[in-house]
Amino acid sequence: MLGASGTTERSGEIYLPYIGHLSDHIVLLEDGSIMSIARIDGVAFELEEIEMRNARCRAFNTLLRNIADDHVSIYAHLVRHADVPSSAPRHFRSVFAASLNEAFEQRVLSGQLLRNDHFLTLIVYPQAALGKVKRRFTKLSGKRENDLAGQIRNMEDLWHVVAGSLKAYGLHRLGIREKQGVLFTEIGEALRLIMTGRFTPVPVVSGSLGASIYTDRVICGKRGLEIRTPKDSYVGSIYSFREYPAKTRPGMLNALLSLDFPLVLTQSFSFLTRPQAHAKLSLKSSQMLSSGDKAVTQIGKLSEAEDALASNEFVMGSHHLSLCVYADDLNSLGDRGARARTRMADAGAVVVQEGIGMEAAYWSQLPGNFKWRTRPGAITSRNFAGFVSFENFPEGASSGHWGTAIARFRTNGGTPFDYIPHEHDVGMTAIFGPIGRGKTTLMMFVLAMLEQSMVDRAGTVVFFDKDRGGELLVRATGGTYLALRRGTPSGLAPLRGLENTAASHDFLREWIVALIESDGRGGISPEENRRLVRGIHRQLSFDPQMRSIAGLREFLLHGPAEGAGARLQRWCRGHALGWAFDGEVDEVKLDPSITGFDMTHLLEYEEVCAPAAAYLLHRIGAMIDGRRFVMSCDEFRAYLLNPKFSAVVDKFLLTVRKNNGMLILATQQPEHVLESPLGASLVAQCMTKIFYPSPTADRSAYIDGLKCTEKEFQAIREDMTVGSRKFLLKRESGSVICEFDLRDMREYVAVLSGRANTVRFAARLREAQEGNSSGWLSEFMARHHEAED
């Protein structure tokens, strides 16, 4: 059919045989066939063992055998395109966290993400041709309506089989959706996406569905094709198999999933009857024998294939494959085409670029256009299962236990991964990685992003730091940071920080007794215990600024030397340990923000570390009443080395897990943590594990201790290049490798991961701008490179 624009250009509508919807999920074609399409999420493959992938391939072959019918055809499409759904609006408490999120999305993610969409199409043909001539004679008799009803029943039966078999792949049958009172055809939108590589809404119209799809002008030539839209134009080229690979394997075309440009991979498979299939194999064998072909092994395999076909180990079909690559201009198209062609050739096929058949190859991408297929070939259902894996990179989850995803990362395939902090309702996370690889930066980034989950829920984040690495992030987000140092006022004053409640009375009695008995000289007498209870009651009745350990001591016996008062004296202000808990003010605020504690200098000072931990965790525990709460600990192995601190933490964590709390831990080598009974228990409870690359990873620790698979261990030790800023996220629901490269956000990295020199530099800026609590931050981000070692 000639187009209106000239004698050499055809109207695109003649290639679009779609009449319209018979129902929400079924479309009628001009030749009387009916069609149904599903979008498939795909299953993760990157870190999966080959045995599982082989099993899926066998299961797909079994499905094809079960639905084999010469009146049925299957199309499989992979569309890699740039229409990535936007993240949900994000709301933060602090200006810095909002700025960090915006910078990350604009500098790291913007323009760097593509999406892989798989589509599966089933086409059921009428038992007899229902073309235009046939319809004239059957219109009045009603036979066509009966035949069509039978086709629809057949389609639904087939669809139930397919949907059941592919349930694990995330199959979503396309139909009609409504938005703001307007009906849109999802099937039409999928067809248009296959045609153009770009998503555009397609409304339901009263006329031809095909006409409603063709809204952009397509011009085909021998070198390529051009698609002209009202906004712009872009070009494409199509590649096909000239010769098939000698062998097929699961996911053999998966290299296309990670290319950094749009493409459309089309495959069709029309079942052959068994006599037709045997004839194909016999003809090929006879041709090789009559020509004196010396490929004896191949001839023998053809004979084996005939036996397998007779045994129903597979079925055969007419297969067609094409790859359409898109670019903005011809120069870019040449480079992209060469790269795509190389990826396909790596699968073992001989790949050619379409020339004179470009127009037919382009339109053959659309389901139902069998007459335009170029270079079809007969293959087995096993081969087809290898070509069509429906494998993909994980997408994460748009929402979880605490609401919408808090961050988006980029996978190895350049696709978006939406990160939620929970696996089901468990928010226990462990991060492992060698020093300097970025684990602290990632942990602090996650803590900043968690503001979204806290802002409307009065939630709290508590962070136990090591060497002040997270101090700048805590201060930048308006939080409180206490660096506890031996011999200087700690900011911990339990008598002044606790309210006058029964819980405070009980805690202080046990806590003061522990202080007294920490000298190893035994317990206190019943009389001293009664005096202590009265003293605590009296102290808590005062205003906070009037309370002190020294004042409490007045209620106890000062002599003899083994008396409780005498033993408590060293903890009073002005004495050896008075700096620890008897200061002028208690600085533990725990308001709806982030509070950081650096106990690095106390970890080896067991006498102070244990009661400090007990007080902090008591204060934290009071916040855990069902409200959202996050406890995070950097280099937590150092905390585990203190047995008293470990004991307090172990008891405390049970409360966290039961009351909507989260735990995020980070450390360098897992083997050091696994040696600790508490560490091993903690890691086992962490449903989310994040690994940075480690060339020295210990096999026993990662596989036996952390339950990594062989593929995951290989990725950690070999595949993830050190310094690439990639991490492996492991969960029961699946594993994925993501990028976290902030090389274009140096000023934010300086805040997320503090070093000794940058912490000192920031402290000087804060001192210079005393009274302006937030002014130091912008100056620091502008001048962080001036920090001297």
UniProtKB/Swiss-Prot annotation:
Transmembrane segments: none annotated. Residues 1-38 form the signal peptide. One of its GO terms (molecular function) is ATP binding. Pfam families: CagE_TrbE_VirB. It comes from the Bacteria. ATP binds at G433, P434, I435, G436, R437, G438, K439, T440. Gene3D superfamilies: P-loop containing nucleotide triphosphate hydrolases. Keywords: ATP-binding, Crown gall tumor, Nucleotide-binding, Plasmid, Signal. InterPro entries: CagE_TrbE_VirB, CagE_TrbE_VirB_cntrl_dom, P-loop_NTPase, T4SS_component. The keyword Nucleotide-binding applies. The keyword ATP-binding applies. A possible function of virB4 might be to provide the energy, via hydrolysis of ATP, for translocation of virulence proteins of the transfer of a T-DNA-protein complex across the agrobacterium membrane. PANTHER family: TYPE IV SECRETION SYSTEM PROTEIN CAGE, UNCHARACTERIZED PROTEIN YJGR-RELATED. Belongs to the TrbE/VirB4 family. This is Protein virB4. It comes from Rhizobium radiobacter. The gene is virB4.
